[in-house]
Amino acid sequence: MNSQVKVFGFGMPWESLYGYSQAAQVGDTVYVSGQLSHDRHGNFVGTDDFELQVRTTLENLDAVLSQFGAERSQIVETTVLVRNLRENFDTTARLHSEYFGKHRPASTVMGVSDLALPDQLVEIGALVRLDVKA
């Protein structure tokens, strides 16, 4: 069986610069690259505001999901990278739980020393199964 890969990008310069897509679908699985806090024009959002960065990052995750006709309840796993994890863990946990409601995907949260952008405090990737009932 020969599967096709469907990719999606926001059209941001860094996608070409680093040679990646925001998400790639193979069959019923969508692999979502780490999302970060930016607006529709690629401007970074939330310098020094961890909660705003998480909320904006999750909004960008929703935008990616919509390109594949997916919903949050079809996310089966998240990977959350956080700078200053000890300081930001409670906020991370609260906002992750708020975002998913009663849905409980598998999740890995890791503290990191740096992320791609100097002011970036969080990055969230996801694994989505389109064959999971939404």
Predicted regions and their residues:
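N-terminal presequence-like segments and the immediate start of the first folded domain
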Residues: 1-59, 63-76, 82-134
